[in-house]
């Protein structure tokens, strides 16, 4: 099935890893994760026992982040999905550029095949095959 896909690449990520200690890296990466969730929640928040978090309950956008790459995609090719993807992409890019890393990206239309490789073993451990 066709969908809309937004691909982003953080610029300067290699230098960030090479020039900063692990504690600082964890802080900044944690902030990036927070900003990804904030973009997906489009500014909506919900109360939880330890404060507030982004409310992703109504988001229809999928996201995967690995190393210096972020990919968002829709579940279909409707105009509503495209609008939500563009809104999420705009908020993510704005936050990335303004607070942490410049990011370059693109939005494309096409087919995406996603396989969840998460597996569990008999001992309760989880691993990923990709």
Tell what function each PLM region has.
Residues 1-9:
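Active-site-proximal structural segments of metal-dependent nucleotidyl cyclase/transferase enzymes
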Residues 5, 65, 124-127:
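A generic fold-level signal
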Residues 10-22:
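Active-site loop/short helix in cyclic nucleotide turnover domains
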Residues 20-23, 120-122:
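Short, glycine/charged-enriched secondary-structure capping and boundary segments
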Residues 21-34:
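A short alpha/beta connector and helix-capping loop motif
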Residues 33-72, 99-101, 108:
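Conserved helix-loop-beta segment at the catalytic/binding core of cyclic-nucleotide signaling proteins
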Residues 74-130:
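Catalytic beta-strand-to-alpha-helix segment of the class III nucleotidyl cyclase homology domain
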